[in-house]
Amino acid sequence: DITDKEIELVSDALRSGWITTGPKTKEFEKKLAEYIGNEKAVCLNSATAAMEMTLRVLGIGEGDEVIVPAYTYTATCSVICHVGAKPIIADVAKGRHEMDYDNLDRLVTEKTKAIMPVDLAGIICDYDKILKLAERNKDKFRPGNDIQKGFGRLIIVADSAHGFGAL
């Protein structure tokens, strides 16, 4: 339930004159960094914006491929298209909503830069299997810049918008 306290806090934020970033955002970023055990956190207006920013920082773009699950939200594929890369759709496992981990290897090519698993509806992907896939396909990985070279394998860009805080 939304209480009067929450309504008051939102009203205070709106009256402060800070429409986007500001003291409340900085306070939230600090608390979020502590919660996830990191030194810093950056908050954007959506997971869509965060995923696109991540792909751009990684230098993923024209001519690159990113593997995504067939069962996901449209933003998973649209951010890949926005940066000029090509989404490669991985089928889901029979009877589940997750990617079929056993059939991902055949999707990896020398153009594949990343895999973007989706923690849909709070169901966390099997990141151990995904990491093993990335390690197994190191020989196909062709880094396009120093950041990608630093990974030395397929980059895992987790879309955890639905899985944030899930264990």
Predicted regions and their residues:
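PLP-dependent aminotransferase-like
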Residues: R56-S160, G165
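N-terminal start-of-chain detector that recognizes signal peptides
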Residues: D12-S16, I88, L167
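Conserved PLP-binding active-site segment in aminotransferase class I/II-type PLP enzymes
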Residues: D1-V57, G61, I130
